[in-house]
């Protein structure tokens, strides 16, 4: 099959719509269930590239959670801690495969943004992963294969309409890309730049300490950024993106946005949050929304009399600004990557407030000296990669 007709394009008025191979060859995908749309396929093909490259670079099962052609989260398949299981709504005794852990962690980066996501898996989808997907609000998944049990589980989701796409893992795209804008065709070479540990050798700070986990985190961050709409900044810890700032015109706004998301991720581990007593049978999205409001400055919206009873069995104590600040100050060992250079040291100042100890960015600012001096002030290890990673 070299063409697949779609219901419409980005919006219902944009018809006709299809995906096809210009050279007349067969599409490298098979739709096993559902009817994916135009944006679904944009998410699918971008997210597949991300997880394929992350698996190749780390030799670990990798997953991503995409919304509107940018990752809400991405991660490698490391085991979940007891706290991870609690904040990601996983049963304590659940038997999880590495690829299931990868997706649970990817979705856990920003569960609000992952609502209605497109999932991407580097490895064959098994029953453990399918069962977790089934419990979440998700639009579809792309993977190189599915076990029979996993496929049957996924076919029961969304009243049988869940989108399941299988991609040929050996497919190699053409070296040139084309895109039409306003009737004008753009051409460029594919971004085949390989991101691996060799990219991390130019350490420009006084502190040269770069443990193996930090190298993995830098790779996870940079590959995530490679498929994030620019400008973009990504915070990572233990092989998991914990804050992705995408599509901002200002670098510092990217760093702030991603940093706030990283802070929100960490606040979900605060003892007061872990101790919240939710009403029985609360839906996962409602629980996610409640946690988000509770940890924000708008906490009164959910703790007001006559309101909190809809969500909690017992009225929670306020998580004060002082408590939040003190908790976030205990965060450490975080890595941050940027798809282009930090123009000033203010990005480093903001990043270190979210526990950043390691930075990977291209370098090349006329104020690199100021950026390096700021990193040195806090004992941060920073690599200049020399490679910009814009994505549009």
For the regions a language model picked out, list residue spans one by one.
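Glycine- and Gly-Pro-enriched alpha-helical subdomains that act as flexible
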Residues: 72-112, 242-342
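Active-site-proximal loop/turn and secondary-structure-junction residues that shape catalytic pockets
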Residues: 70, 125, 237-240, 248, ...
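Nucleic-acid 5′ end/cap handling module spanning
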Residues: 220, 228, 235-238, 245, ...
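Flexible, glycine/charged-enriched surface loops at secondary-structure junctions
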Residues: 57-65, 164-167, 230-237, 267-279, ...
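C-terminal binding/interaction regions
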Residues: 72, 117, 121-122, 135-165, ...
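Conserved helix-loop functional segments at active or binding sites
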Residues: 53, 227, 264-268, 353
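Gly-rich Lys/Arg/Thr-decorated short loops/hinges at beta-loop-alpha junctions or inter-strand turns
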Residues: 23-35, 109-115, 189-208, 285-307, ...
């Amino acid at each position: 099959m070299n063409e697949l007709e779609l219901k419409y394009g980005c919006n219902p008025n944009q018809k006709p719509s299809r995906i096809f191979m210009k050279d007349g060859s067969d599409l490298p995908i098979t739709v096993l269930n559902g009817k994916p749309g135009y944006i679904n396929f944009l998410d699918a093909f971008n997210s597949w590239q991300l997880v394929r490259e992350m698996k190749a670079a780390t030799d670990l099962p990798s997953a991503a959670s995409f919304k509107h052609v940018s990752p809400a989260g991405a991660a490698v398949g490391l085991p979940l801690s007891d706290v991870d299981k609690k904040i990601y709504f996983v049963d304590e005794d659940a038997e999880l495969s590495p690829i299931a852990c990868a997706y649970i962690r990817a979705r856990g980066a920003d569960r609000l943004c992952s609502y209605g996501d497109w999932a991407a898996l580097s490895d064959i989808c098994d029953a453990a992963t399918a069962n977790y997907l089934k419990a979440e609000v998700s639009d579809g998944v792309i993977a190189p294969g599915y076990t029979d049990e996993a496929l049957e589980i996924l076919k029961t989701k969304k009243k049988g309409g869940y989108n399941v796409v299988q991609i040929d893992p050996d497919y190699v795209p053409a070296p040139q890309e084309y895109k039409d804008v306003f009737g004008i065709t753009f051409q460029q070479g594919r971004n085949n730049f390989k991101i691996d540990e060799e990219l991390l050798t130019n350490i420009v700070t006084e502190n040269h300490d770069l443990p193996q986990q930090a190298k993995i985190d830098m790779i996870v961050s940079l590959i995530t950024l490679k498929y994030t709409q620019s400008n973009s900044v990504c915070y990572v810890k233990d092989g998991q993106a914990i804050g992705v700032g995408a599509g901002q015109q200002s670098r510092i706004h990217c760093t702030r946005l991603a940093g706030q998301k990283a802070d929100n991720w960490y606040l979900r581990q605060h003892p007061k949050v872990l101790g919240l007593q939710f009403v029985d049978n609360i839906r996962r999205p409602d629980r996610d929304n409640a946690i988000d409001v509770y940890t924000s400055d708008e906490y009164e919206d959910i703790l007001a009399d006559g309101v909190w009873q809809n969500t909690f069995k017992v009225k929670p104590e306020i998580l004060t600004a002082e408590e939040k600040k003190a908790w976030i100050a205990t965060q450490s060992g975080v890595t941050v990557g940027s798809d282009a250079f930090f123009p000033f040291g203010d990005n480093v100042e903001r990043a270190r407030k979210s526990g950043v100890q390691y930075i990977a960015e291209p370098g090349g600012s006329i104020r690199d000296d100021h950026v390096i001096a700021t990193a040195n002030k806090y004992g941060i290890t920073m690599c200049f990669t020399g490679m910009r990673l814009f994505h549009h």
